[in-house]
């Protein structure tokens, strides 16, 4: 058996990253182009376009693709796509840019020219409408909503050429990987069914349990962590990487899972983001996506299993990557081990509910972490990290306590 096909009608990866002489030529041309500044989210999206993670997109979306993605989870040509991938700028700058012009795309933090774009469309959007459709709320306290509302007032659509993957390859050497690289690793391992485990938290016992369930039914698991920006109080990617390494070294059979990373910022779009996570994992070669409690959620904006239900609401042929839906998991003292609502007959009094939010709150406030919450080797890494912090970040517990 072979790996799942890349997303889209052509079923081939479409990386937009230039190399060699073509890269040098385009970088030289970009020096004389008008500059458009990229937010952190837009830079991550551009890199994903570059490495083929957002196959089959050829650039930032025009109006019809934006509208279709927002309202119907599909592009203008009917290809399934659940979240808009857009670039914005101010009205003042947009007025100066002509259709057909080429612009240099510059990361706002590093100042690096990340790529170039041919402007094919300029269009204004109803930001609140996008937020209500994608996030199911336009509450500015939602970090994803705030991200959209802070965008420029005009979107620029057009095809891109990508120059750089930023600092990700050097900063996360051996962890950050392109779809072509993960696919080769899976093939070299003889894997055809691969489950992706999405994480933005250090792995606690529930996470470990989910991954081991997937190992039982798939050839292997890609522990695939987000390397881009998160909200305040979340734990940085380098710390999470170290936590995953010690967990894999001490509690997993060698050759059953691979740690990887990808360059996106978190959108916190809950169910819709779960669909995007499955879509780009298909490009990375994964046949399944582990979907647990409150996947990609934040606060109490989504029900604990809304991300399960949304996969039942899309066309059956929308994605080749399928969800592995796993119920609420916890440590049960009477079962004397990890369990789920489907396997444990006991009551809440017998259970230790494990979540990343709870773990961060306990560590941030210097509380003792209960036994069975996380492996001691992982806690040692986390204690070292929290000892370096000079400011305390308040972490609110939500009803769903998404992991």
From Swiss-Prot:
GO terms for molecular function: ATP binding; sulfate adenylyltransferase (ATP) activity. It catalyses: sulfate + ATP + H(+) = adenosine 5'-phosphosulfate + diphosphate. Pathway: Sulfur metabolism; hydrogen sulfide biosynthesis; sulfite from sulfate: step 1/3. It is an enzyme of class 2 (transferase). It holds the Pfam family ATP-sulfurylase. Keywords: ATP-binding, Nucleotide-binding, Nucleotidyltransferase, Transferase. Its EC number is 2.7.7.4. Transmembrane segments: none annotated. Coiled coil: none annotated. GO terms for biological process: hydrogen sulfide biosynthetic process; sulfate assimilation. CDD domains: ATPS (cd00517). PANTHER family: PTHR43509, SULFATE ADENYLYLTRANSFERASE (PTHR43509:SF1). Belongs to the sulfate adenylyltransferase family. NCBIfam families: PRK04149.1, sopT. This is Sulfate adenylyltransferase. It comes from Pelodictyon phaeoclathratiforme (strain DSM 5477 / BU-1).
């Amino acid at each position: 058996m072979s790996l799942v096909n890349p997303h889209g009608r052509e079923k081939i990866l479409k990386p937009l990253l230039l190399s060699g002489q073509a890269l040098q030529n385009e970088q030289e041309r970009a020096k004389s182009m008008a500059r458009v500044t990229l937010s952190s989210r837009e830079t991550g999206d551009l890199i994903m376009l570059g490495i083929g993670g957002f196959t089959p997109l050829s650039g930032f979306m025009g109006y019809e693709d934006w509208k279709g993605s927002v309202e119907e989870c599909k592009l203008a040509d009917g290809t399934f796509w659940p979240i808009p991938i857009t670039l914005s700028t101010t009205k003042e700058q947009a007025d100066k840019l002509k259709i057909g012009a080429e612009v240099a795309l510059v990361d706002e933090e590093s100042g690096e020219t990340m790529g170039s774009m041919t402007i094919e469309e300029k269009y204004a959007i109803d930001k609140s409408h996008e937020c209500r459709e994608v996030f199911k709320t336009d509450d500015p306290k939602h970090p994803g909503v705030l991200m959209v509302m802070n965008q420029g007032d005009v979107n620029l659509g057009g095809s891109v050429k990508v120059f750089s993957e930023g600092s990700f390859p050097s900063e996360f050497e051996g962890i950050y990987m392109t779809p072509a690289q993960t696919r080769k690793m899976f093939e070299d391992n003889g894997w055809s069914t691969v489950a992706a485990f999405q994480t933005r938290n250090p792995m606690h016992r529930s996470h470990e349990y989910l991954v081991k369930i997937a190992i039982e039914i798939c050839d292997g698991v890609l522990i695939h962590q987000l390397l881009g920006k998160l909200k305040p109080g979340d734990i940085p990617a380098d710390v999470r990487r170290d936590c995953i390494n010690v967990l894999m070294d001490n509690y997993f059979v060698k050759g059953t899972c691979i740690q990887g990373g990808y360059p996106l910022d978190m959108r916190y779009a809950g169910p819709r983001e779960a669909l995007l996570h499955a879509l780009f994992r298909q490009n990375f070669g994964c046949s399944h996506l582990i979907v647990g409690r409150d996947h990609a959620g934040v606060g109490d904006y989504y029900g604990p299993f809304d991300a399960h239900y949304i996969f039942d609401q899309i066309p059956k042929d929308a994605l080749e990557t399928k969800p592995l839906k796993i119920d609420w998991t916890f440590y049960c003292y009477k079962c004397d081990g990890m369990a789920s609502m489907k396997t444990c007959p006991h009551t809440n009094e017998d259970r230790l509910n494990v979540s990343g939010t709870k773990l961060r709150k306990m560590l941030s406030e210097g509380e003792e972490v209960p036994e069975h919450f996380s492996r001691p080797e992982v806690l040692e890494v986390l204690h070292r990290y929290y000892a370096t912090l000079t400011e305390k970040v308040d972490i609110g517990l939500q009803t769903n306590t998404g992991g």
